[in-house]
Amino acid sequence: MAIQTLDYRDFQYGGQEQHRTFCHNLCETLSTWGFIKIQNTSIPDAVIDELFSYNKKFFALPEHIKQKARHPAAPNPHRGWSAVGQEQLSRIAGFEKDEETDGFVPEYRESFDQGAADDELFPNRWIDEDDLPGFRKFMENYYEMCYNFHTQLLRAISTGLSLPEDLLLSRHQTDTSELRMNHYPAIACENLKFGMRIGEHSDFGTLTLLLQDSTGGLQVEDQKKLGTFIPVESDSRYEVIVNVGDCLQRWTNRRLRSANHRVHLPEGKNFKSDEVLADRYSVAYFGKPDRNVLVDSFPEFCRGGESKYNDHMNALEYNQTKLLRTYA
């Protein structure tokens, strides 16, 4: 069972029928799985190659250099370098299911988070230019590429759901999204609790745009058989994996699914306990709405006025509710 793959050129350059079909298939797959893969995006292959190069270079820096951009011990500002184990996503595993998390899964991952360059509420944290020349400028430029791609996908979803084209975009007037580089250090299989490098969780925002290497291990929960996970493998490092975040699930009253996902031992191989898993690298852009917009369900998706989400929280309040748990 494989997650569907779409060709972005059908949306970007195709005729009216190709455009319509892309939007329809995008929404149908996100309704069924919450995940989809998109090839031939607006992000050039050469940029992705350089992105992974910077990813490896940054995490290979000595710890005292990465400490210059250290994420605080507190949840905010959610910026900078987090050491292995500093964040614990397993604490929010059952958040959107209204379930209490019953198992702590240690995280074997370090990360680097950044937001928009002009975000005054949560300013970015950077290492010095001499520590990794060109890193900051490149990452800021890549962030803008993701912002533009995210914007186009929101238009496509509005079309696929027969909503006004700018309905979703109107809730993204200020740039509050985040970009994260991940590094999963090599580790012996016997040291992984439940075979996981990070525990299951869902994402906070509207859409996540993920690039990953070929190491494998990403799994998504089957929305028709909760508790069962299937692998999400990339055919190439240039393929963008797109998944629905909690805010988009809430707006659509669960029409589009924010599926739990995790990083597990790759399937299809019997690992010995002393076998060492290779380093794993990925980069995720978390598209997020304006901080002051409500994340209640849209009336268009509430048959008979029934809504699963009517707690009148805005996006920042919702984001903080989950973030405070992960960095508790």
From Swiss-Prot:
Domain Fe2OG dioxygenase residues, every copy: 175-289
Which residues are Fe cation-binding?
A: 201, 203, 261
Query: Which GO annotations describe the biological process of this protein?
Result: small molecule biosynthetic process
Q: Which residues make up the binding site for 2-oxoglutarate?
A: 280
What SUPFAM superfamilies does the annotation carry? Answer: Clavaminate synthase-like (SSF51197)
Q: What is its EC number?
A: 1.14.-.-
Asked if the Swiss-Prot or TrEMBL record annotates the protein with the keyword Metal-binding, the reply is yes
The metabolic or biological pathway listed in the UniProt record of this protein is: Mycotoxin biosynthesis
What Gene3D superfamilies does the database record attribute to this sequence? B-lactam Antibiotic, Isopenicillin N Synthase, Chain
Instruction: Tell me the function of this protein.
Output: 2-oxoglutarate-dependent dioxygenase; part of the gene cluster that mediates the biosynthesis of pneumocandins, lipohexapeptides of the echinocandin family that prevent fungal cell wall formation by non-competitive inhibition of beta-1,3-glucan synthase. The 10,12-dimethylmyristoyl side chain is synthesized by the reducing polyketide synthase gloL/GLPKS4. The thioesterase gloN/GLHYD exclusively interacts with gloL/GLPKS4 to maintain turnover of the polyketide side chain.
**Family recorded in the similarity comment:** Belongs to the iron/ascorbate-dependent oxidoreductase family.
Q: What is the name of this protein?
A: 2-oxoglutarate-dependent dioxygenase gloF
Q: What gene, per UniProt, encodes this protein?
A: gloF
